[in-house]
Amino acid sequence: MTNIRKSHPLMKIVNNAFIDLPAPPNISSWWNFGSLLGVCLILQILTGLFLAMHYTPDTTTAFSSVTHICRDVNYGWIIRYMHANGASMFFICLYMHVGRGLYYGSYTFLETWNIGVILLLTVMATAFMGYVLPWGQMSFWGATVITNLLSAIPYIGTNLVEWIWGGFSVDKATLTRFFAFHFILPFIIMAIAMVHLLFLHETGSNNPTGISSDVDKIPFHPYYTIKDILGALLLILALMLLVLFAPDLLGDPDNYTPANPLNTPPHIKPEWYFLFAYAILRSIPNKLGGVLALAFSILILALIPLLHTSKQRSMMFRPLSQCLFWILMADLLTLTWIGGQPVEHPYITIGQLASIMYFLLILVLMPTAGTVENKLLKW
């Protein structure tokens, strides 16, 4: 008799995806972030669900409902901080996952990569809307500033912004719809993630060398299941250290002040994981130019496969490209730092230089390095 694992219509899907899946024998810990993102998503959905049971999406009660969760609901404080810091862990894993894809040339799996870009944008939208829900000062002003950017779109901009707001300013209607979207999007993300996996399993995983591993595969279980469980335990350890010892480390103190449309905070800034894009936005004096640069800074990922000039897939054996890759990482850290600084000298200039470097590295220097390396290897 055939094993039920391999014959049952539902179980064979799970079997082919997580148990008998042929996997490369040499994938490093950089390949753990995919499963960690799955863990993050499940954690966020569960904690979010319990928060939604006590939260009220109304301008008059939103802030106090979050206070009520932290003070009066059993273990409400830990659920709230796991959800807030879980978002930070989610983005750490996301950026590591994308960085891995860039370094090892995983973007040559076009469908998988493009769906990944869509996932990144959806997660960013979800996180932004979630940040508005506690209805603190930074929630309100963050929502006002970011939605207002759409008014830079010619002709339809103002109408578009008022349509998103549901009025003439960020108000009750905005909060209600943001809560509705913030609730539904994680489930949509889960569905897109399944399509992401489906396309990945059409080709099989890449590996650090960038060379096909079809001649030498090992089963996913037990080798990578145990590796993923270890990764998940380390992720949860890091999250709980953050939640239990420094829950407000990555947050903004301004968000402990209830939203007040009559009082603008001195420095409006998003959560740390959006600071690099915010720095690029601020470094261009023109509003429409800034919005376009902001959009392109993320959408540029979709162009990466077209900018690949090397005859080798991975950067493992390409020292010149490696060097530029790590300069790009340093540049992104610089942008993240600048995004959190006030708009004054010398930060403005540093931000502009870092923004120019970001686009120059991706669009010009890295493709050139690929061509140069081909020439050096007489290819």
Swiss-Prot record:
Heme b b562 binds at residues 83, 182. GO terms for cellular component: mitochondrial inner membrane; respiratory chain complex III. Heme b b566 binds at residues 97, 196. One of its GO terms (biological process) is mitochondrial electron transport, ubiquinol to cytochrome c. Binds 2 heme b groups non-covalently. Its cofactor is heme b. GO terms for molecular function: metal ion binding; ubiquinol-cytochrome-c reductase activity. SUPFAM superfamilies: a domain/subunit of cytochrome bc1 complex (Ubiquinol-cytochrome c reductase), Transmembrane di-heme cytochromes. Keywords: Electron transport, Heme, Iron, Membrane, Metal-binding, Mitochondrion, Mitochondrion inner membrane, Respiratory chain, Transmembrane, Transmembrane helix, Transport, Ubiquinone. A ubiquinone binds at residue 201. The chain crosses the membrane at residues 33-53, 77-98, 113-133, 178-198, 226-246, 288-308, 320-340, 347-367. InterPro entries: Cyt_b/b6_C, Cyt_b/b6_C_sf, Cyt_b/b6_N, Cytb/b6-like_sf, Cytochrome_b, Cytochrome_b_C_euk/bac, Cytochrome_b_N_euk/bac, Di-haem_cyt_TM. Coiled coil: none annotated. It comes from the Eukaryota. Signal peptide: none annotated. It is a multi-pass membrane protein. It is found in: Mitochondrion inner membrane. Component of the ubiquinol-cytochrome c reductase complex (complex III or cytochrome b-c1 complex) that is part of the mitochondrial respiratory chain. The b-c1 complex mediates electron transfer from ubiquinol to cytochrome c. Contributes to the generation of a proton gradient across the mitochondrial membrane that is then used for ATP synthesis. Belongs to the cytochrome b family. Heme 1 (or BL or b562) is low-potential and absorbs at about 562 nm, and heme 2 (or BH or b566) is high-potential and absorbs at about 566 nm. This is Cytochrome b. It comes from Bos javanicus (Wild banteng). The lineage of its organism: Eukaryota, Metazoa, Chordata, Craniata, Vertebrata. The gene is MT-CYB.
